[in-house]
A protein has these predicted regions:
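Membrane-embedded alpha-helical bundles of multi-pass transporters/translocases
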Residues: 3-246
């Protein structure tokens, strides 16, 4: 081609790394789909809470989101560990997600109404504004930390979308029937929440250990053509995450 040299981008990931990374959206959507679609049904029909009060508590809880987005983005940016910057937050953050998700669906029916509202608000706020935020921001950051290849980043996003769509579809389709199968009532909701938490822990762990973050030296290396604009920028990640839909 008359001296024209085609430079091919260096590849960093195998197909199973990309698939494994994508399974992290199974974990994220086990939380998101289950909570957003069924928490109000559980709280009003099983626990007997007022939907208006619950809605107000959820709205108040979301006020913390913007602050925690910035906080965890900054924390990830300054993290140095053997696992890298983002993977520790993604890994440990989901254990918090699992505990608090179970807590939301395990409100003791023996408590008074005020205590039940307080239980829900605390568990929901910790889940949404703390643990889910930490896990989700770290998960999003990984695409810039494990590869500098733009095509691989697009492919990682495609696997995320596939697993996200599939998980949402399954959760929406089977949850009500599963609750009825376990007898309905508070015990059934706790059982389903526990099952989803285990699924989330397994798939999140798989996603975390399916990829390895590049070293700081590799991330700063501009030898790959066209990568100058793709350097890791947590400020950009934070801005994107602030605009994302929370639980």
């Amino acid at each position: 081609m008359k001296g024209e040299i085609l430079m091919e981008e260096k590849t960093y990931l195998k197909w199973y790394n990309k698939v494994g990374y994508g399974t992290g959206d199974i974990a994220g959507n086990v939380v998101y789909a289950f909570l957003s679609s069924f928490v109000m049904i559980y709280l009003t029909n099983t626990v007997g809470l007022n939907s208006g009060i619950v809605g107000t508590l959820i709205a108040v809880s979301k006020l913390f989101d913007g602050v925690t987005d910035i906080f965890f983005g900054t924390m990830i940016d300054h993290t140095k560990s053997k696992m890298g910057k983002a993977r520790p937050w993604m890994f440990y953050g989901f254990f918090g997600c699992a505990i608090t998700l179970f807590g939301v669906f395990a409100i003791p029916t023996s408590l008074g109404k005020t205590a039940q509202y307080a239980w829900f608000f605390i568990a929901y706020t910790l889940l949404n504004a703390v643990f889910y935020t930490a896990n989700n921001i770290a998960y999003a950051a990984l695409t810039s930390l494990v590869t500098k290849n733009s095509k691989e980043r697009v492919q990682m996003g495609s696997f995320r979308f596939m697993f996200s769509f599939g998980t949402n579809l399954v959760i929406q389709s089977v949850t009500v029937g599963a609750v009825e199968m376990f007898g309905g009532g508070a015990t059934a909701w706790r059982t389903i929440a526990f099952i989803y938490c285990i699924i989330g822990i397994i798939t999140n762990t798989l996603a975390v250990f399916s990829v390895k973050e590049l070293s700081d030296e590799e991330l700063k290396d501009d030898s790959v053509a066209g990568e100058e604009d793709d350097k890791l920028s947590f400020k950009k990640i934070i801005k994107l995450q602030i605009g994302r839909a929370h639980v």
